[in-house]
Amino acid sequence: MSNPHSSAVIVLAAGAGTRMKSAKQKTLHSIGGRSLLAHSLHAAAGLSPQRIVAVIGHRREQVRPEVEAVAATVGCEISVAVQEQQNGTGHAVQCAMHELEGFEGTVVVTNGDVPLLRSETLRSLVDAHTAVPTAVTVLTMSLSDPTGYGRIVRNEEGEVTAIVEQKDGDEETLKITEVNSGVFAFDAAILRSSLGKLDSNNAQGELYLTDVLSIARTEGHPVRAYRAHDHRELAGVNDRVQLAQAGKILNQRLVEDAMRNGATIVDPDTTWIDSEVTIGRDVIIHPGTQLLGNTSIADNCVLGPDTTLTNMVIDEDAHVIRTHGFDSRIGAHANIGPFTYIRPGTVVGENGKLGGFVEAKNAQIGRGSKVPHLTYIGDATVGEESNIGASSVFVNYDGVNKHHTTIGSHVRTGSDTMFIAPVTVGDGAYSGAGTVIKEDVPAGALVVSGGKQRNIEGWVEKNRPGTPAANAARQAHAHETKEG
């Protein structure tokens, strides 16, 4: 037998997955912010194997870039084997073994559509496999309803004597509740030898990987099984219903992990957390919150309700309420929301504020500066301790190009100020309400625009006679005359 202490992993991801009814290859569908395949590859990488081989086939032009992207993040070599014709699991492993030429050790075979399988379970499988000399160890699970699965038949020594498919089992065999998961650990040398002896003499006309077990036993090699503690880890995803079910189980796992690590999640059923999200201690997450992508939440933050953060960094003690944010950073002790839209490239400094119905895009808001209400701020820099009045607009687009606005520190702008970029407002400047700023404003200046207010008496009654407005004006004048 081979040296059991070195390992390699084969991940099977060549199938068509027709039940997904999708233009996307099955294993590229996502739960928890990762594709099904990425979950499987991450679990495999958790073994720290010498090599991982992903077997691809159907729509491989879609799958190969995903394999390469995961390889760049897990710190483990992942090679690709192409199964040109989908001729069964045995054939898929034959294709993979070309990438493992000369490898001697334990070969784990798993699938690209089992996103809930943990590295720890694979490690337990390998440990069980290597504890005593073994040719094959099959990962099994116990089900209350095993209908449709291959049954695991053992002898008195606990060795697996057969995997009996549902259609081939007799009455006693079908009472067995331990079933085949489709995940195996093999001795590399015995696997390589047995693969060459497979035949397609079966109903499907394919090469079955499970036949390696019977070949190994026939040649006198021990075959064993290791039972997984949680059968849900081994649930395959073949259609959209199973995708949603797996996503819910994974989210429950991630939410519970966050709570065990010190976060308060008020309503776990309405809180969604992606796999790459990190959450500090004493964070409070209110209902309807989604933390997606590579979002990072520091200690003591309060999030939600009804908040979605994607690839966001939230520093300590920040409050984010009813906000959608993407690819941006919120500083310590900042206050965001409600009904705030944060677009990519925005940075809010310490003690900063983006208030109700504010949209920010590629905006740098300095320490202590506030944009409290009803404002669009795009392509802008705001210094420290400045205040932007309600209903202000940073007019950054001339129809062809985007332009930048720079606001200094300790600036106070009146409500309904328009900043026509490119423009700079110096430190300590003020603007009057309704000002349209088209030119740079010096530090400490007060800027106002527009002429003196002019009231044209009687205009409505003269130009809009008979309208409700004219009638109201006439009645008001009559009342004023009577009062006079």
Region locations from a protein language model:
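Short glycine-enriched, charge-decorated loop/helix-capping segments at active-site entrances
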Residues: 24-30, 198-201
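Structural signal for interior beta-strand "rungs" in well-ordered beta-sheet cores
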Residues: 264-449, 453-455
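Long, low-complexity, intrinsically disordered segments
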Residues: 476-484
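Conserved N-terminal catalytic core of the sugar/cofactor nucleotidyltransferase
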Residues: 1-8, 34-110, 114-127, 466-469, ...
